[in-house]
């Protein structure tokens, strides 16, 4: 076997990989089956037969999505709305998680499939049944199916759009007929929206021919009945993350008062932040360490998992959004689906202010697709002409909108010179503005040493607008929320600080009072080898060090427990390549020497500083080359390699450096070394947690 791993070790490793995969999938299925949220089911009748639902609801087009973080769902819904607006089609848009597909060959309409790739070429967790069905479909079993497909992936990963390509391969083998080209969005290149627009334009031309469609001027038709109500009741949402937290509901707890899950995208846990501190502060950057207490729930996590943190929008951005659309935040409204295959996107009834603060993603970049949809609501002819031009010209859109980091309100105020967009219906905003999604952070604690506490390490995004020096700074929604909490928790008067944005820290009905936020744990395959004697190479600059702090704390706790039990355990070599700009932003600087002492010399840390005064820039990939002999020996002795951090630059640079190390160490070509790196990734010995 290659790289010093014998047959027994390889068998154990393969079993481990399979076990982790099964655990992740099993957990998703278990969570789906255990959920008691009635809004999760897309069809009110509970019918899971996809062909029957399409037929019974008189649909003439089907859009399916398999989404891990909500992006595929967002684009599927955009596409569905355009089919309705331009061609008056009766479209069903559905999550594959909610249906069975044995009758897929009997679906009498064309199907569009939007599918995200998760991890190492995997299908999203909710697509277990869909993946199983298409991968086991026999030749000719889907010969009646006509479909098109759009994949969402990241080219910095080894298996770029792997799920979409796998789905397309198996659908084709089963006889399904693909219409048009396979679309591939590349988040790694930052071109997801433009990739979608190019694919969508080509597919619409195909559909015009296939279905003999006549395009009409886009006209918004809501999927919901919108009703204004008069009074607030206990059953009305004021921004609660799910209906479970309304006063009219009772949370599910055991005899000890522990809140029971499952906790996931549909129902997060409201976790107290018991401690937060600033790791460093400079003129342009801050880093916050936050500790979330999970002891009031039955949530379990493993070292290497991610914590999903649900933010609310900053008060300044909420006010800006309300102003440009001339909306009254106190207006109470309800939404009722006009179609049984459609679900309400968030708890209603609610107020306009609550929806905008808690449920809609109002601070993100605006898309050309949204501009195209907004043309019908332009406040005057000049603005309509501008919108039309920008929605069709991606280069001009990039110059005027994207490069300036405009959100929706910024862009519309810029285009209309401050004129209100007061003819835009609230239903349009609900259906066109993306839903708020959680932000995922690599957990920086160990489940062995902090069993019921999760640590998160976050750089606060806050920088001047590069194109508009007089504009407000560009800010990250969740990281600035964590900074607001850190200051308040440490008795700093926020009113006296120069913060770029502020938040309602109490939340709906004071649900978030005393520093709480909605969270859930997302399982990861980013795991230490089960054999403690296995060598480990960790590479993580900046906040990419977060999971490795968890890894090392795990090894410290393990070694201490073994010593207490009288066991003499020998740890394999653990080396961490860490990078920071300078000594001022060296994360957890005081902790690492203590870990080295406790691990009896089995832990070594190598630091690269990229911005020390009067010195050459040094990055982690440079340090890998400096330690080439040691790195090669460790890999040859079966080391596991872990990389965490920036996908575009660092992760590629690290991969290139390791290819060079293997090429020189084994006296093989670069291509051969590249194939060896691919083998390591496939076997689970080279793992990445990158963004």
Curated annotation (Swiss-Prot):
Cofactor binding, per record: Binds 1 FAD per monomer. Binds 1 FMN per monomer.
GO cellular component assignments: cytosol; endoplasmic reticulum membrane; mitochondrial outer membrane; mitochondrion; plasma membrane
Residue ranges that the UniProt entry lists as topological domain Lumenal: 2-7
Gene3D superfamilies membership: 3.40.50.360, NADPH-cytochrome p450 Reductase, Chain A, domain 3 (1.20.990.10), Nucleotide-binding domain of ferredoxin-NADP reductase (FNR) module (3.40.50.80), Translation factors (2.40.30.10)
Binding, FAD: 439-442, 457-459, 476-479, 691
Flavodoxin-like domain ranges (all copies): 61-204
InterPro entries named among the record's database cross-references: CysJ-like_FAD-binding, FAD-bd_FR_type, Flavdoxin-like, Flavodoxin/NO_synth, Flavoprot_Pyr_Nucl_cyt_Rdtase, Flavoprotein-like_sf, FNR_nucleotide-bd, NADPH_Cyt_P450_Rdtase_alpha
Primary location recorded for the protein, binned into one broad class: endoplasmic reticulum
Cell location: Endoplasmic reticulum membrane; Mitochondrion outer membrane; Cell membrane
Membrane-related topology note: Single-pass membrane protein
Chain ranges on the Cytoplasmic side, renumbered to this chain: 25-691
Family the entry assigns: Belongs to the NADPH--cytochrome P450 reductase family.
Function (record text): This enzyme is required for electron transfer from NADP to cytochrome P450 in microsomes. It can also provide electron transfer to heme oxygenase and cytochrome B5. Involved in ergosterol biosynthesis. Has NADPH-dependent ferrireductase activity on the plasma membrane.
Protein name: NADPH--cytochrome P450 reductase
Organism: Saccharomyces cerevisiae (strain ATCC 204508 / S288c)
């Amino acid at each position: 076997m290659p790289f010093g791993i014998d047959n027994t070790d390889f068998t154990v490793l393969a079993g481990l990989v399979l076990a982790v995969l099964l655990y992740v999938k099993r957990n998703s299925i278990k969570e789906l089956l255990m959920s008691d949220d009635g809004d999760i089911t897309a069809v009110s009748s509970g019918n899971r037969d996809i062909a029957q639902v399409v037929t019974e609801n008189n649909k003439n087009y089907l859009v399916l999505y398999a989404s891990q973080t909500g992006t595929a769902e967002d684009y599927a819904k955009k596409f569905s709305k355009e089919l309705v607006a331009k061609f008056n089609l009766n479209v069903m848009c559905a999550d594959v998680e909610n249906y069975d597909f044995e009758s897929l060959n009997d679906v009498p309409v064309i199907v569009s499939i939007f599918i995200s790739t998760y991890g190492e070429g995997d299908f999203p967790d909710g697509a277990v049944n869909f993946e199983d069905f298409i991968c086991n479909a026999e030749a000719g079993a889907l010969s009646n199916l006509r479909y098109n497909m759009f994949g969402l992936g990241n080219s910095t990963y080894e298996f770029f759009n792997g799920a979409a390509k796998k789905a397309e391969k198996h659908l084709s083998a089963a006889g399904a007929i693909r219409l048009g080209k396979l679309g591939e969005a590349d988040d790694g290149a930052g071109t997801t929206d433009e990739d979608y627009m190019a694919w969508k334009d080509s597919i619409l031309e195909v559909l015009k021919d296939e279905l003999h469609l006549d395009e009409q001027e886009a006209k918004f038709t809501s999927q919901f009945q919108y009703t204004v109500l008069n009074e607030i009741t206990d059953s009305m949402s004021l921004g609660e993350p799910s209906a479970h937290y309304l006063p009219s509901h009772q949370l599910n707890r055991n005899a000890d008062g522990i809140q029971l899950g499952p906790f996931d995208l549909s129902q997060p846990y409201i976790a107290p932040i018991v401690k937060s501190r600033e790791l460093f502060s400079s003129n342009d950057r801050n880093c916050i360490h936050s500790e979330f207490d999970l002891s009031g729930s039955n949530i379990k996590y493993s070292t290497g998992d991610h914590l999903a943190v649900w933010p609310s929008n900053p008060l300044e951005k909420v006010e800006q959004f309300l102003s440009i659309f001339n909306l009254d935040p106190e207006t109470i409204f309800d939404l009722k689906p006009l179609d049984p295959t459609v679900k309400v996107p968030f708890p209603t009834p609610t107020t306009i202010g609550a929806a905008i603060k808690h449920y809609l993603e109002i601070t993100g970049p605006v898309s050309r697709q949204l501009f195209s949809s907004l043309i019908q609501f332009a406040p005057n002819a000049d603005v309509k002409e501008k919108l039309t031009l920008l929605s069709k010209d991606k280069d001009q859109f990039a110059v005027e909108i994207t490069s300036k980091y405009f959100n929706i309100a910024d862009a519309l105020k810029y285009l209309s010179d401050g004129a209100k967009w007061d003819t835009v219906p609230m239903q349009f905003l609900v259906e066109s503005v993306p839903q708020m999604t959680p932000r995922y952070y690599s957990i920086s604690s160990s489940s062995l040493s902090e069993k019921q506490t999760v640590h998160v390490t976050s750089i606060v995004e806050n920088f001047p607008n590069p194109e508009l020096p007089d504009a407000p700074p560009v800010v990250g929604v969740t990281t600035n929320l964590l900074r607001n909490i850190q200051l308040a928790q440490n008795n700093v008067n926020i009113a006296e600080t120069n913060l770029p944005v502020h938040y309602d820290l109490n939340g709906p009905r004071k649900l978030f009072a005393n520093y709480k936020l909605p969270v859930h744990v997302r399982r990861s395959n980013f795991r230490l080898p089960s054999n403690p004697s296995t060598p480990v190479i960790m590479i993580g600059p900046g906040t990419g060090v977060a999971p490795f702090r968890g890894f090392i704390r795990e090894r410290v706790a393990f070694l201490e427990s073994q010593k207490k039990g009288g066991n003499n355990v020998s740890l394999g070599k653990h080396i961490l390549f860490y990078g920071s700009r300078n000594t001022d932003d060296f994360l957890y600087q005081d902790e690492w020497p203590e870990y080295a002492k406790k691990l009896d010399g089995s832990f070594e840390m190598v630091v690269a500083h990229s911005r020390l005064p009067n010195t050459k820039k040094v990055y982690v990939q440079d340090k890998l080359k400096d330690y080439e002999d040691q790195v090669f020996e460790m890999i040859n002795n079966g080391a596991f390699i872990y990389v965490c951090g920036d996908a575009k630059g660092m992760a590629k640079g690290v991969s290139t450096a390791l290819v060079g190390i293997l090429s020189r160490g084994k006296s093989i070509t670069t291509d051969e070394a590249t194939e060896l790196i691919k083998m390591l990734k496939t076997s689970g010995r080279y793992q990445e947690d990158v963004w």
